[in-house]
């Protein structure tokens, strides 16, 4: 049982943007979007470092396999989000988090390892980053964790971001963390899987520090909802690439209205 999530709540001090966060006072909320993750959610929750995490919010979208019940028994706070969309679930979790200093986003399929969460927190805690991204392409991956078409699509999107935004990243993975004040200042609004890219782009354009951290990656438990097939990857990649270009030109028009 992980009752320690609520018992280890620390002081609610919120230092100004750009300063270091005290390890002893920081409040960390973990948001986990789920849809039929009964096979994996228990392992995800069990592996979260209880001495680091203040609260866990499982945002469930119409699961029919008992996912919310499993998560609730393990101490997670359950948020029901009947509306579809990965981004919508993440936004719901961000909005409902209880006065956090840092918000972590983690999938419920056990492809990322929750025990590696401190790696994402470290650059934020020592004042080097405002948003940290877990890169699955900088560390050795388990065989079959990412098919070639997903690797190609992620590298293509990351390459376009490097060119247009001058942000040196290698991956668009879902395991990430950010200062709560920064994430809320970005006014994120994407309700699809494009939400993860929106965070990166808006963060960079607003002048916040976006830093990558290597994380391991493993075959998910259960079937992918988005990009497990070549067809799904192509559709996701096209949407993400168009989003990257659209935000770039929108920003240029906003800065130079006479040249729009």
Please state what every model-predicted region is.
Residues 2-24, 163-166, 188-260:
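Hydrophobic helical membrane-anchoring modules
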Residues 27-29, 55, 198:
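Cell-envelope/extracellular polymer assembly enzymes that use nucleotide-activated donors
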Residues 35-50:
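Short, well-formed alpha-helical segments that are part of the catalytic scaffolds
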Residues 37-40, 63, 86, 113:
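Donor nucleotide-sugar binding loop of glycosyltransferases
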Residues 53, 99-100, 128-132, 208:
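Short, high-confidence coil segments that cap the C-terminus of an alpha-helix
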Residues 60-68:
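A conserved acidic beta->alpha catalytic loop
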Residues 82-84, 88-96, 114-193, 219-235, ...:
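Acceptor/aglycone-binding surface of glycosyltransferases and processive sugar-polymer synthases
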Residues 100-111:
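Short beta-strand-to-loop acidic/aromatic patch adjacent to the donor-nucleotide binding site
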